[in-house]
Swiss-Prot record:
Lineage: Eukaryota, Fungi, Dikarya, Ascomycota, Taphrinomycotina
Region feature Disordered, mapped onto this chain: 116-149
Keywords noted in UniProt: Membrane, Phosphoprotein, Transmembrane, Transmembrane helix
Modified residues (Phosphoserine): S21
Domain of life: Eukaryota
Cellular localization per UniProt: Membrane
Membrane-topology descriptor: Multi-pass membrane protein
Transmembrane segments: 48-68, 72-92
Name of the molecule in the record: Uncharacterized membrane protein C622.01c
GO cellular component, as recorded: membrane
Extent of Acidic residues compositional bias: 127-142
Amino acid sequence: MTVDNVFIHAVPREQIRRRYSYFEAFEKNCHIQGILSKRALYMLIPCFMEFAVGSIVYSFGVPGWVLGMNTVLAAGFLVMFLFLVWPCFQLVDERQIEEPGEDEMALNAGGYYPYAEEVPPPSYPSLEEENEGNEEIEESEEMNTLLSK
């Protein structure tokens, strides 16, 4: 049992289990997957640009193979977007929590948390002890100066 588990189970379940909006879930899941959301969303820009260019080109009566290539490019960008970004939306949008074991429930029942015990303050050396060390250094420096003469 780790400290994190004890802390998670000590918090009321209502506070932990909350629904995230799709945007929050997208941000969290993109962070988990190592996908920067801005870069992933920027992939939609060329997709829309290709569709826009395709519609403009079509209105001018350009040959069909140009329109076909344009549509293929736009579809390619759309597929790349779907494969890279859409899984972020499909991940869990509610935090999953494992149920606490018997030991953890027994610990939490009494409000006893191992990490909350009082820790004695660190013992610092007294001023006299610190000065003794300084005096020894001063004496050794005096001896060195006398010996060097």
